[in-house]
Amino acid sequence: MDKQIVYRVEDGMDRSKVLCTTYQMRNFYSQFRDGFFTNLDVMNYIQHFAAAQMAKKGMNIVDVCCGRSLMLPLLRYYAKGIASYTGVDISRANIKEAMRGATEKKLKPEDLGAYYPFKVRWKLGNVANMSDIIPEGFADFVIYTSALEHMHKDDGRKSLIECRKIMSDKALMFLSCP
């Protein structure tokens, strides 16, 4: 039997049948706007802000387990001159949400070029086999935040090996786990 992708593991679920969870971090932009945020929301924002500031001109950025692509607004304002952003996620629903929420203006995916000064795209796939959908040596900067804890250890290890495959020789990686 194939393992399932689930939103989150609930009481009574057989964990051996779960491939990964797709539960996402809260949208810290909305949390701050509404005045209801936690230390975790602040930590997530700081991590994303730090990663955006590390991005340099000409870089191809890959956001591993991108969820709703909360990196995009920060990259737009703080990562001047990057070449591209590619978000990778195993969940079609997460990618659809990322595409819908890519701007406050709710642009259609085909109109993102008018809003972002770099190429924006998403890839659906398992990060444990990421080099099947992202060319080896493509990424100049890999951002991998708050995701390893959502998958089995073997897949987590495989995903790190896959990150190295898609990274260019001088690439950077921003990796975090809560």
Residue ranges and their predicted role:
Residues 157-169:
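A short glycine-rich, Lys/Arg-flanked "PGG" loop and its adjoining helix->strand segment in the class I
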Residues 1-54, 58-59, 64-131, 174-178:
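Class I (Rossmann-like) S-adenosyl-L-methionine-dependent methyltransferase catalytic domain
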Residues 144-147:
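A short beta-strand submotif of the Rossmann-like class I SAM-dependent methyltransferase core
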Residues 149-151:
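A short His-aromatic
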